[in-house]
Amino acid sequence: MTLTERLREKISQAFYNHGLLCASYPIPIILFTGLCILACCYPLLKLPLPGTGPVEFSTPVKGYSPPPADSDHKQGEPSEQPEWYVGAPVAYIQQIFVKSSVSPWHRNLLAVDVFRSPLSRAFQLVEEIRNHVLRDSSGTKSLEEVCLQVTDLLPGLRKLRSLLPEHGCLLLSPGNFWQNDWERFHADPDIIGTIHQHEPKTLQTSATLKDLLFGVPGKYSGVSLYTRKRMVSYTITLVFQRYHAKFLSSLRARLMLLHPSPNCSLRAENLVHVHFKEEIGIAELIPLVTTYIILFAYIYFSTRKIDMVKSKWGLALAAVVTVLSSLLMSVGLCTLFGLTPTLNGGEIFPYLVVVIGLENVLVLTKSVVSTPVDLEVKLRIAQGLSSESWSIMKNAATELGIILIGYFTLVPAIQEFCLFAVVGLVSDFFLQMLFFTTVLSIDIRRMELADLNKRLPPESCLPSAKPVGRPARYERQQAVRPSTPHTITLQPSSFRNLRLPKRLRVIYFLARTRLAQRLIMAGTVVWIGILVYTDPAGLRTYLAAQVTEQSPLGEGSLGPMPVPSGVLPASHPDPAFSIFPPDAPKLPENQTLPGELPEHAGPAEGVHDSRAPEVTWGPEDEELWRKLSFRHWPTLFNYYNITLAKRYISLLPVIPVTLHLNPREALEGRHPQDGRSAWAPQEPLPAGLWESGPKGPGGTQTHGDITLYKVAALGLAAGIVLVLLLLCLYRVLCPRNYGQPGGGPGRRRRGELPCDDYGYAPPETEIVPLVLRGHLMDIECLASDGMLLVSCCLAGQVCVWDAQTGDCLTRIPRPGPRRDSCGGGAFETQENWERLSDGGKASPEEPGDSPPLRRRPRGPPPPSLFGDQPDLTCLIDTNFSVQLPPEPTQPEPRHRVGCGRSRDSGYDFSRLVQRVYQEEGLAAMRMPALRPPSPGPPLPQASQEEGTAPEKGSPPLAWTPSTAGSIWSLELQGNLIVVGRSSGRLEVWDAIEGVLCCSNEEISSGITALVFLDRRIVAARLNGSLDFFSLETHTSLSPLQFRGTPGRGSSPSSSVYSSSNTVTCHRTHTVPCAHQKPITALRAAAGRLVTGSQDHTLRVFRLDDSCCLFTLKGHSGAITAVYIDQTMVLASGGQDGAICLWDVLTGSRVSQTFAHRGDVTSLTCTASCVISSGLDDFISIWDRSTGIKLYSIQQDLGCGASLGVISDNLLVTGGQGCVSFWDLNYGDLLQTVYLGKNSEAQPARQILVLDNAAIVCNFGSELSLVYVPSVLEKLD
């Protein structure tokens, strides 16, 4: 699978899960979306309606005079001047833009020194402006004569009376915070607190007091303790009532003479007249409102032909609300991030939102209504989103790529449009995926099946070849189980390929081709290309300026040589180049330091002499007022009861002022508390970090670009926040059973199968499985190695089956002649124990940790014993050197098959066999014991080894002898079967010959679990102990093909031992107290053995030497299920219903989840999922990495533990006479297979998946062998 296919699959899965979430919890999602819309639209309360923002008009400064009060141009004659440009303006605004910095900077300065000393110079500037007088031939003119005189503030602004001027000239500066008193400023210990004390606590989008007095947005002022640019910017705002050109020119000349800006290239050519419209402009809204009405009508007209939509007008209204909310959210978010959207220069943006939103609505509607109607609503929504997920994400990625390219063209018009567009796309995607999808799910949910049956479908209008009495909609015939719910399936393609109405064809064409979005993207690319080439301040000019600046021939003179990265610049804050060493003494006032720039003097020769000034000016500084809120000037004039509605003001060119402050002035301007405050000295920053930004044309620096980058970063952060919110909502509200439709929680019903990619639901099928019969009682143990299948029932009978053909190869014990007509039979189980006199057949004791298991030589089966005699082989004693006691001290609990009749004549053996006959009388129907011979030990020793109580509840017809005990565990590898019995006896059988290879004569506690891995056998016992055994053969092992039907070309998955070999089993290690209570679970993999016990703990052993590595504690109940694989991932389940994931390498618990309300009965894992089942009849699927529950499947009663994993994507579960196949990735029910009438009433108690794509189902005393290759081929 390629990367694109994997990415497409992941995106499809994400959209599928999202559709399930929206359809499962519609009301909370709609409420959440509504809150998000309101929160994003809150900044719009302070914005004008579209079309009511201020309008600009520029005129040259040279020769300017106020226009006459009456327009002199004729009616209907075209004119360049707008209609509102008549008469004198309300006021003339003159801003003196001040940039100041402390240079050079060294590490001994504090953060407060960045702005305290520069702000102190504002008082001197204000004093210079107030004292300026124009003297010419006509007389003298002072500021008081030409400025706008204001009176009292409005009565509701008492708090601002000490900050804003009254009864005098309207002059604003940062000094107003301290009533223009330098002493008050110098005595203020907290400048930041004074500036922000009148800031609103909530979100404020209109002009604030700080913006009014500073004249620049707060983020550009540099008055902050955490600024990285050590530069302070503010303006001194003068408001004139009359335009006096000579006075303004003299004021500009004086200020530029006192505070020169040598690198300033600001143009002072134009006046900008700003006209403010009425607060409510209905006329401008008519085109946009008309567009949305047309959108509503078109969607309603189009959806009238879609029968799958319940409320046509409701869907159209939801589409309009989605598009309108997307527009409002975009404008609100842009305002929140610092942009001032007026939509004057981009009226096309709302209409683009309409077009894009309409197309997305049509795409989603078409995709959802095209899904099969027999599916549940949430599955239809999920499949509809999943089918369009790739195209949606591909178009969104393309649009974002075009926007990103356009943003980095450095053209302001393109950058503004791109910022609006990216926020608009994110908000539109958010609303489409949450709001409209949820509303669509609610509408489709109202479309009940009863409503569908009330109207005739289109296919009923077709001529029918059958009689008229045929029903209109064909029902799929249910061959069996007529009581089950019917399934409505789609008709064949010949019925479905009807001619659609024209309006639907238009909708489907737009949705299929996405023509509108592609045309918009193409137009955007062309527009960006034209603006990039023609814009004078765009990327082309910027690159040309960079080349010219670095060229030695640029502009006819040698430009500044670029400094390598390893060379320190002049303003580097290294101590060796600092103007003040850390321990430098304070100098007298009449001395200056080398390299310092004295006031009113040129640059001195020294280390800190910088020919490139740090304070730079760029084209964006000419009209900095544009960055202010559009309500900045109306708010200022409203304070004095002056309205700007239907009037205009004139903005004069900015007067630049540059202030260079040396460190000594910053130190002298400190407040005594500054050194003891929390403003700790900041670490020095490289000079490049606090310069204005990248240099633009002419060597200027465009720090406005950095602002745009910040806005883009904020937009990206907003998108990430929205995604995180969606993720949190998904994690919190995601239904745990979203993958299963139906009435019950997470329970699938027949007839509710999801459809495939072609729109068809997979049918329910019924097959005739291979039924494996031969057990008298319920099957308890199953084992397989892929080619052989071994089963054991409660009666102790072991059957070996061919997993390919279902033939019974061997039965252990072998059947013999019937004894009576009751249906039972005595099978020949007596091996040739009498042939022990043939020497060498019984292996002697070998040195080791414990006595070896006795092996049995192979040979033909001997004749059976008399059916009416008990087994007296236990009384045979070959040790003639020891005198037997007259009576055994311990009872001999041996049960064998026999009639128990005694002889009438002959030697009286009653003293020896009386107890055996009495016991045989209690259980006369039991068969002879299957026991290897004992060559030497005396009878008491044999009695002690095999002393176990008989089974109380055994049926009269049983297969396993009571002395050996019932079979508790079973394992298979190759052709060897390892059996663990309740008496503690371990037996190794040949699966093909049906003979006993070897057994353990040391009777101990019952074997509860077995592990047969390679040549090692591990037995877990009831008393909590572990025994490690090793299989050995006297000749080499060779993989052989066991006897079976021809045609199986594959070899067995494990080694098959040759029949000529003699197998012995030695116990290598014993852990006497592995657990304090019985061991209930045992698994081995990757050289590790994991045990689980009723003492609530797990233990990890090394398989080689039985060394205990870890004891894992985390469950509050007995361990019931354990899983471990080759990746060292361990999962455990207990009676507390919890599932724990462990790291076998470290012994640490990775996660814990409470999965079930009862015991965890089985546990398995795939590469990405953990699958568990419990006594609550639920199968839960968990994410393996996060431990989050994906979904659950409710099983039929008694089928909770019947599950199997065929592959990483396919799960099989059992039901009442059926098996179901599920897609693990999506939780989809793929197919349900019924196993015939014989198994209809039987629950599948156990499922075993074989290597040859076969499934073995345990239905009580019968097994069903099922092959489902079609599902496997489809998934693979």
Curated annotation (Swiss-Prot):
Please list every transmembrane segment annotated in the UniProt record, as residue ranges. Answer: 19-39, 280-300, 313-333, 345-365, 402-422, 424-444, 519-539, 708-728
Where are the annotated glycans?
263, 590, 641
Q: Which residues form the SSD domain?
A: 284-442
Question: Any idea which UniProt keywords this protein has?
Answer: Cholesterol metabolism, Cytoplasmic vesicle, Endoplasmic reticulum, Glycoprotein, Golgi apparatus, Isopeptide bond, Lipid metabolism, Lipid-binding, Membrane, Methylation, Phosphoprotein, Repeat, Steroid metabolism, Sterol metabolism, Transmembrane, Transmembrane helix, Ubl conjugation, WD repeat
**Which Pfam family would be a valid example here?**
Sterol-sensing
Residue spans with biased composition (Pro residues)? Answer: 930-940
Cytoplasmic topology ranges? 1-18, 301-312, 366-401, 445-518, 729-1276
Q: Under the GO molecular function aspect, what terms does this record hold? A: cholesterol binding; protein-containing complex binding; sterol binding
Concerning InterPro entries, the annotation shows:
Beta-prop_SCAP, HMGCR/SNAP/NPC1-like_SSD, SCAP, SCAP_N, SSD, WD40/YVTN_repeat-like_dom_sf, WD40_repeat_CS, WD40_repeat_dom_sf
- Signal peptide residue numbers: none
* Keyword Protease (UniProt): no
Quote the Gene3D superfamilies the UniProt record gives.
YVTN repeat-like/Quinoprotein amine dehydrogenase (2.130.10.10)
Region span, Interaction with SREBF2: 731-1276
What are the start and end residues of every segment in region (Disordered)?
60-81, 669-698, 834-903, 927-960
Q: Which family does it belong to?
A: Belongs to the WD repeat SCAP family.
Q: What is known of its domains?
A: Loop-1 binds to loop-7, enabling interaction with COPII-coated vesicles. When levels of cholesterol in the endoplasmic reticulum increase, Loop-1 binds to cholesterol instead, thereby disrupting direct binding between the two loops and preventing the SCAP-SREBP complex from exiting the endoplasmic reticulum.
Q: Could you tell me what this protein is called?
A: Sterol regulatory element-binding protein cleavage-activating protein
Gene that this sequence comes from = Scap
